[in-house]
Amino acid sequence: MTHRRTKLFMMAAVVSYVMTSCGAVPINDLLDRASQRSDQLHSLSTTLSQELDSHFPPIGRVIMPRPSMCHTSALQTPNDKTQALQVSESELLSLARSLLQAWADPLSALSSSAFSLPHPAQSSIFNKVREMQEHSKNLGDGLDILSGKMGEAAQALSSLPFRGNDVGQDRISKLINFHFLLSCFRRDSHKIDSFLKVLRCRAANTQPEMC
């Protein structure tokens, strides 16, 4: 019993140290790290899309759902940098966190589907999806810390439920639905990256036209 209490005390001390250390990091540095991670995440999704394109059936481009069908499309977000610069810092962070959180289940669905995806680069695709999951989680943890420093508005989250766990049964359906889901993630990862870059720019007191 004494050993167990000692172990629990040590774990609590480690958690306390980590939280204190994170709390001591300036917002500018946290935004730099978050921006770097979001850039890596978007770059990875782009590379994965290109890899998937190498053996994507032509019919797939014709019947693939439109971007407006992405499960995150209901969230109203700035369409470009000019609009993003008009949104408050707290709201931008809230939007980035909402988008990222909305991809926890879809990324799991992509990971499960990639395990048996009918594609010559299946193994590479599977590994990249797992890597995206890891990057997404790490980024989410960082944004949670940031939101705690930026007030209640930054901590607000919009619910964007995902109901498409089954990507299909036949080869064509699997490839098309996988590609569609990945294209949605690539679009959203670009938004997240853009929002965080605007936040980083503002934190550095850079002139808006230079962001």
UniProtKB/Swiss-Prot annotation:
Pfam families, sorted: Hormone_1
Chief location bin: secreted
Signal peptide: 1-24
Gene3D superfamilies: 1.20.1250.10
The entry's keywords: Disulfide bond, Hormone, Secreted, Signal
UniProt GO cellular component terms: extracellular space
Gene Ontology terms, MF aspect: hormone activity
Cellular compartment(s): Secreted
InterPro entries (UniProt xref): 4_helix_cytokine-like_core (IPR009079), Somatotropin/Prolactin (IPR001400), Somatotropin_CS (IPR018116)
GO biological process: positive regulation of cell population proliferation; positive regulation of receptor signaling pathway via JAK-STAT; response to nutrient levels
PROSITE patterns per the UniProt record, alphabetical: SOMATOTROPIN_1, SOMATOTROPIN_2
Disulfide feature: C70-C184, C201-C211
Annotated family: Belongs to the somatotropin/prolactin family.
Protein name: Prolactin
Organism: Paralichthys olivaceus (Bastard halibut)
